Curated annotation (Swiss-Prot):
Belongs to the universal ribosomal protein uS2 family. One of its GO terms (molecular function) is structural constituent of ribosome. Its main location: plastid. This is Small ribosomal subunit protein uS2c. Keywords: Chloroplast, Plastid, Ribonucleoprotein, Ribosomal protein. It comes from the Eukaryota. One of its GO terms (biological process) is translation. It comes from Emiliania huxleyi (Coccolithophore). InterPro entries: Ribosomal_uS2, Ribosomal_uS2_bac/mit/plastid, Ribosomal_uS2_CS, Ribosomal_uS2_flav_dom_sf.
Amino acid sequence: MTVVTLGELLDAGVHFGHQASRWNPKMFPYIYAERNGIHVIDLVQTARLLTHAYEFVQKASQEKKSFLFVGTKRQAASIIAEEAQRCGGHYVNNRWLGGILTNWSTVQKRVEYLKELDAKEEDGTLDRLPKKEAAFLRREQEKLSHNLRGLINMTQIPDIVILVDPKRETTALLECRKLGIPIISILDTNCDPNLVDIPIPANDDAVRSVKLIISTLADGILEGKQSYQ
C-alpha cells in the first residue's frame, strides 16, 4: 500500500523529467522511458520511495525529531514555507546562507537578534526611537526576516532535512553530508541520487508536483506527532 496513488502522481505531473540530454546516468533506475527528448520518471518507483520517506518521517516525528525544509526555487518557495509551518518544521525558502548548519552557533545569534527586533516592533519600542534609528533597525529586521524567518523557532541543528532540487541547494546538501544529517530529497532526472539518503524521483519544476510530495511528507510528520499529543 502506497501513500499516494499512481493516478495522483500522474495528475500532478510528477512523471515529467528534464530533457534527456541533461540527464544524470545515475538516475537510470528511476526512468521509465524517453518521449520526444524528455525523460519520463517511473511513478511506481516514486510511489514506493515516497511511501518509504513518509514512514521514515512519521517514525522520526514520533521520536520528537526536528525537521528542516529547504527549497529556494520560485516554484517551491511558498510551498516549503506553508507545509513546514503546517507540520511544525523549520524552513529556508529564500536564500541558503552558508553555515546555517555548519556554523549554527553564529547563525543562531542572528536569529536571536531578529527575535529581539520583532519584540521591539510588537511592543512599540521602534516607534518611540528617533526616526533614523528606527528606520535602520527596520531595515535590519526586514533583511534578517527575508533569510531567517523560517528558522525563528529552531534551537538546534535539525535531525532531518527535506530538500527540493539538490542541484540548486548544493551548499545545504554539502553541509548536511558533512554533519551526517539524513537527507530526503525530490530528485529530477538531472540529479545524483547517491548524494541523498532517501531519493524521491519527481518533477521538481512543476508546482503541483512539488506540492504533492512536500505536503505528503508534512502529513507523515503530523501523523507521527499525533502519537504523543
